[in-house]
Swiss-Prot record:
Physiological role: Catalyzes the attachment of glutamate to tRNA(Glu) in a two-step reaction: glutamate is first activated by ATP to form Glu-AMP and then transferred to the acceptor end of tRNA(Glu).
Ranges spanned by the short sequence motif 'HIGH' region, renumbered to the chain: 14-24
NCBIfam families: gltX_bact
Cross-referenced InterPro entries: aa-tRNA-synth_I_cd-bd (IPR045462), aa-tRNA-synth_I_codon-bd_sub2 (IPR020751), aa_tRNA-synth_I_cd-bd_sf (IPR008925), Glu-tRNA-ligase_bac/mito (IPR004527), Glu-tRNA-synth_I_codon-bd_sub1 (IPR020752), Glu/Gln-tRNA-synth (IPR000924), Glu/Gln-tRNA-synth_Ib_cat-dom (IPR020058), GluQ/Sye (IPR049940)
UniProt KW keywords: Aminoacyl-tRNA synthetase, ATP-binding, Cytoplasm, Ligase, Nucleotide-binding, Protein biosynthesis
GO molecular function, one term: tRNA binding
Subunit structure: Monomer.
Classification via Pfam families: Anticodon_2 (PF19269), tRNA-synt_1c (PF00749)
Swiss-Prot/TrEMBL GO biological process terms: glutamyl-tRNA aminoacylation
Coiled coil regions in record: none
Protein name (Swiss-Prot/TrEMBL): Glutamate--tRNA ligase
Membership in a protein family: Belongs to the class-I aminoacyl-tRNA synthetase family. Glutamate--tRNA ligase type 1 subfamily.
Source species of the chain: Herpetosiphon aurantiacus (strain ATCC 23779 / DSM 785 / 114-95)
PANTHER family xrefs: GLUTAMATE--TRNA LIGASE, GLUTAMATE--TRNA LIGASE, MITOCHONDRIAL-RELATED
Length: 495
């Protein structure tokens, strides 16, 4: 008999106000993993009811970010589903009907006081040393009945409990008890004068109607949790499993911000971080499988993810550690797969075609093992591989001549090496290794006197992949041509 949990329905419900940031992605990942672990469904819902903060194009950025990172949704925009529409601005009648239902139950009311009137009353109360308003009906100087009869605009507010306790259960922190009298929270707006709902109403209604079983969200929602809990109670609905995950912190222990590296997910991908590394690393911020396992495939994360292992304390996002994870993934990636990943960066650098050919991909696959150990970001590939595709431009004589070396002698050595290479029949790394070491020994030279000029001649730099392996993959013709060019450049500079 399987001990697999009951299939869960989780969701990501972003507001289209900007990009999906790396800190937010961690919470999304937890929701996605739990749905996959239980064999359930992960929903995407767009909470676009705050029209003042709405940013054109943000929804497309959010969906493309999830697609780029590989966290596809089972229901929501693009894919549809039985609970469509999945955009809250297209569900206004649903929220309006539920707001009216709460009014009918006597747990919500229409407030006809305008924002200016409330501000004026609060100013007067403050001058008298009284606290600000918590309830917004039957206010002095405002005739609610007359305004209702005149068809005036109104907000719908929830009548928060002011006695007793609101007892909530969180999977991470356990039971939390709120003293309703001590909350001192103003009755929250559920429906605005423009007919649009607030988060408090829309999110709770949608979570219930869409069958969300587990609500995973940041622990910064805990202070306003009594509102959401009381809305569920007012409707008589079963509460979902509430899971308040710890904040993602910066290296200084403060909430993650842009200065810590909390930039958009697409920016990280554009820089050359691979989804596998991002997902693996983020999964470990606030959660762990055990005390020692760090590297896990997506399949392993799905199999091992358990909400009960989420820690209540915040986890630190360390960009350097993410970079380390990324390097490990790149080093362990099959060259053919890695070639596909670096190809767009090589294309952008003008080293290969915009649409890479099979021959170009084969070449990249051949070159990559020589630099793979040094690769930490896909975007570093053009700098590491450029000399395989284009000849070095403008040799620096200071680089061609070894320390304490002689330019004329170096030109002579390059000429002798070229002659030796021309006679080579088997052009591979072992043969070239033997040939060059024999060459050094026979002439009584030191290795740097020979190897350094060759390295600079073929790559244009003093640091490159293994010399013999590089010579082998560049091929005989390219090697001879570059040595000739380098020798000529040095000879001209020495005149």
């Amino acid at each position: 008999m399987s001990d697999r949990p009951t299939p869960a329905r989780t969701r990501f419900a972003p507001s289209p106000t900007g990009y999906l940031h790396i800190g937010s992605l961690r919470t999304v990942l937890f929701s996605w993993l739990w749905a996959r672990h239980t064999g359930g469904q992960f929903l995407l819902r767009i909470e676009d009811t705050d029209r003042k903060r709405f940013v054109e194009g943000a929804e497309e950025q959010l969906t493309s970010s999830l697609q780029a990172i590989g966290l596809m949704w089972d229901e929501g925009p693009i894919v549809g589903g039985p609970h469509a529409p999945y955009k809250q601005s297209e569900r206004l009648e649903i929220y309006q009907a539920h707001a009216q239902a709460l009014i009918d139950k006597g747990v919500a009311y229409r407030s006809y006081a305008t924002a200016d009137e409330i501000a004026a009353i609060n100013a007067e109360r403050e001058a008298r040393g009284e606290p600000k308003l918590l309830v917004f009906r039957n206010l002095p100087g405002i005739d609610d009945a007359a305004r209702e009869a005149a068809g005036a605009d109104y907000n719908v507010r929830l009548s928060l409990k002011t006695t007793g306790q609101t007892v909530v259960q969180d999977l991470v922190r356990g039971q939390i008890v709120f003293d309703n009298a001590a909350l001192k929270m103003p009755d929250p707006v559920l429906l605005k004068t423009d007919g649009f709902p607030t988060y408090a109403l829309a999110a709770m209604v949608d979570d219930h109607l869409m069958g969300i079983t587990h609500v995973l969200r940041a622990d910064e929602w805990i202070p306003t949790w009594p509102i959401h809990h009381q809305i569920y109670e007012a409707f008589g609905w079963e509460q979902p499993v509430w899971v308040h995950v710890p904040q993602v912190l910066g290296s200084d222990g403060k909430k993650l911000s842009k200065r810590h590296g909390d930039t958009s997910v697409t920016e990280y991908i554009d820089l050359g971080f691979v989804p596998e590394a991002i997902i693996n690393y983020l999964a470990l911020i606030g959660w762990s499988y055990d005390d020692k396992t760090e590297f896990m495939t997506l399949e392993e994360l799905i199999e091992r993810f358990d909400l009960n292992r989420i820690r209540p304390s915040g986890g630190v996002f360390d960009r350097d550690k993410l970079l380390h994870f990324n390097g490990v993934y790149l080093r362990n990636m099959a060259p053919a797969e890695l070639a596909q990943r670096v190809a767009p960066y090589l294309s952008k650098a003008g080293l290969i075609s915009a649409e890479p050919t099979a021959a170009e991909l084969a070449k990249i696959t051949e070159y990559l093992p020589l630099v793979q150990d040094r690769l930490k970001l896909l975007s570093e590939a053009p700098e590491l591989l450029d000399f395989f595709f284009v000849d070095p431009q403008g040799y620096d004589p200071a680089l061609l001549v070894p320390k304490k070396g002689d330019p004329a002698q170096t030109v002579e050595i390059l000429g002798q090496v070229k002659a030796s290479f021309e006679a080579v029949e088997t052009w591979d790394a072992p043969s070239l290794d033997k040939l060059l070491h024999d060459f050094v020994n026979q002439l009584g030279l030191k290795i740097p006197q020979v190897f350094m000029p060759i390295r600079v001649a073929i790559s244009g730099r003093t640091t490159s992949p293994g010399l013999f392996e590089t010579l082998a993959v560049l091929g005989k013709a390219v090697t001879l041509a570059r040595i000739s060019t380098a020798a000529a450049a040095l000879s001209s500079a020495s005149v």
